[in-house]
């Protein structure tokens, strides 16, 4: 894994893997973000766009059930900007299973192409974060299980929903779903994936 900071305020993460035996590879990045800054409250007012028409419903153990479902008419539709908190407490079985958002999104961009997956905007600071990737999926986690035990910048605790994750990846539980994009890596093959977190300020 290689991390690069670029001149255009991008954190670029490049993943490469090889193997001498057939194996499963699905690398991702589980950093937490709060664009208001450390110790400045929850992320419920962050405005989020995810460029996906489908998401992966999960069981009570947060394992995908199978075929992706349309986001149309559900609290999972972020194709236009919504605040994270606008619908997170809706009476929805999937939100109940995850105690909020903790779901994979099937990105709309063409498979294996590098494209825009998500955009987050925090209105108080004006900070914007875009996620660009060549992965087929994006896991959106709204910090539903944060309890203050983990510390971030300045030693500030991550409390309930005070940070979010946008994790570019192949779909969770892919080895058990032959119809999902493959995560199998064989000898002689090279696994390569790239994800960029691009930061700017909206004035």
Residue ranges of model-derived segments:
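An exposed, glycine/acidic-rich loop-and-rim segment of catalytic or binding clefts
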Residues: 1-203
């Amino acid at each position: 894994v290689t991390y690069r900071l670029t001149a255009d305020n991008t954190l670029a993460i490049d993943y490469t893997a090889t193997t001498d035996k057939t194996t499963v590879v699905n690398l991702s990045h589980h950093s937490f973000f709060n664009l208001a800054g450390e110790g400045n409250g929850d992320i419920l007012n962050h405005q989020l766009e995810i460029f996906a028409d489908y998401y992966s419903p999960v069981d009570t153990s947060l394992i995908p059930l199978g075929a992706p479902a349309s986001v149309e008419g559900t609290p999972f539709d972020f194709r236009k900007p919504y605040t994270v908190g606008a619908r997170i407490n809706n009476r929805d079985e999937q939100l109940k299973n995850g105690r909020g958002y903790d779901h994979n999104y099937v990105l709309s961009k063409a498979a294996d192409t590098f494209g825009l997956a998500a955009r987050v905007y925090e209105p108080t600071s004006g900070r914007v974060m875009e996620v660009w990737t060549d992965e087929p999926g994006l896991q959106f986690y709204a910090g539903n299980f944060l309890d203050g035990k983990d510390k971030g910048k300045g030693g500030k605790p991550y409390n309930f929903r005070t940070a979010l994750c946008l994790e570019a990846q192949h779909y969770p539980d892919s080895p058990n779903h032959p119809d999902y994009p493959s995560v199998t890596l064989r000898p002689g093959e090279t696994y390569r994936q790239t994800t960029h977190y691009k930061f700017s300020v909206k004035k």
